[in-house]
Amino acid sequence: MSKKTPQAIRGTQDIFSADAEAFAFVVETFERVRKLYRFRRVEMPVFEKTEVFSRAIGETTDVVSKEMYSFEDRGGDSLTLRPEFTAGIARAFLTNGWQQHAPLKVATHGPLFRYERPQKGRYRQFHQIDAEIIGAAEPQADVELLAMADQTIRGLGIEGVTLHLNTLGDAESREAWRAALVEYFRAVASELSEDSQERLEKNPLRILDSKDRRDQQFLADAPRIDAFLSDTARAFFESVTTGLDAAGVKWQRAESLVRGLDYYRHTAFEFIPDEGSEAAGKLGSQSTILGGGRYDGLMESLGGAPTPAVGWAAGIERLAMLVGGAGFDPPIVVLAEHEHLFDTARLVVQALRLSEITAEAEFRYRRTNKAFDKFKKTGTDVFLVVDQVANLNGSHQIDIRLSGVLPDEEEELKLLAKRVELSLRLFFPDLIPKADPEKQAISWYLSRK
């Protein structure tokens, strides 16, 4: 047996410390907003029959043809690790009879798998938050879903991000637009990139999304969807934009924003950092942080009845890159000045935790100067030190001293001191605030014989 330690698989990651806290903060914020909007939580299998994805996503897409982790199980069935959530949720909707709950609002989060080149903020095992509304054909469903997405981003404290919005029209509009695009690009087919030449007959809308310079020179004059919108499709899009304005969600039109698969209808959208913003600087070329659209034709591809639906997904890793240390709540570290006070210090820690104050203590006694150094290296700047002082009458008192550095030190320490005092009184009802003329620290004492 080899003694060499196995390494992590390329494209995977071990998330730790501040990165893990930021990751958790994204999930916690999403869960909080999900509950505000009354989206039901669902948990989906990590793997499905391969046909769930090949039929839902499309055989010709890069995801299905190049990026899926598929394998044959012992029974001979072809299974695939999920590359996205929507197909599995659609399958569950059909096989579990969730039609009875329509319109159904569901949300989930978890790991997904795609075999692609790892890069900044993108991995082969990655994680997403996901929200879907199934069985609602009204444009107000799109507005609600987008308002939820906007509130999630704002709840994370991410600024400088704008909703980019387009319409793909209804089936009639889309087909007319598709035919016009094929005619337009056929005239310059020999000058297009190899990928776009391949897409010309199979998926011409994807050419509009090309970043290749050979294609981009022709995009400005390509036919636009607005010229082909039916009255119904135009009214739908106007209802969405009017609803967004009423909800206070800022948006801008993005006519080049498309979805290549035929089952997409009407609304397509992405939340993208503004040029020059802090978010754009952190993400680099991987600019989109949340995207989705209306997929009214998906259920039919899985053998179901026509069912309107709209959804979005966002990468947790990418969002975590933008929140920085927002998810990290620095603890109060409780230290004992002397070894015989160690148990008292542990009691102080428990009082803080029972009051929902993040607190930490050593597992064994350590001199306070060494403990200070250790915890400060981890970014901790707030301490409660338990000490003992002898009085002239032979009694002694236990001092509990709060000290630390906070962004707005004076005010924040005062507020924190009030919370700490209330929590300490759970176990120490005879706690007495101690006057400190020099204001070097906030402290309390307990009289003991």
Curated annotation (Swiss-Prot):
This protein's record includes keyword Repeat: no
Main subcellular location: cytoplasm
A matching Pfam family: tRNA-synt_His
Compartments, as annotated in UniProt: Cytoplasm
InterPro entries tied to this protein: aa-tRNA-synth_II (IPR006195), aa-tRNA-synth_II/BPL/LPL (IPR045864), His-tRNA-ligase (IPR015807), HisRS-like_core (IPR041715), HisRS/HisZ (IPR004516)
Biological processes annotated in GO: histidyl-tRNA aminoacylation
UniProt keywords, alphabetically: Aminoacyl-tRNA synthetase, ATP-binding, Cytoplasm, Ligase, Nucleotide-binding, Protein biosynthesis
Catalytic activity: tRNA(His) + L-histidine + ATP = L-histidyl-tRNA(His) + AMP + diphosphate + H(+)
Gene3D superfamilies tied to this protein: Bira Bifunctional Protein, Domain 2
GO-annotated molecular function: ATP binding; histidine-tRNA ligase activity
PROSITE patterns: AA_TRNA_LIGASE_II
Assembly with partners or alone: Homodimer.
Family listed: Belongs to the class-II aminoacyl-tRNA synthetase family.
Identification of the protein by name: Histidine--tRNA ligase
Organism of derivation: Erythrobacter litoralis (strain HTCC2594)
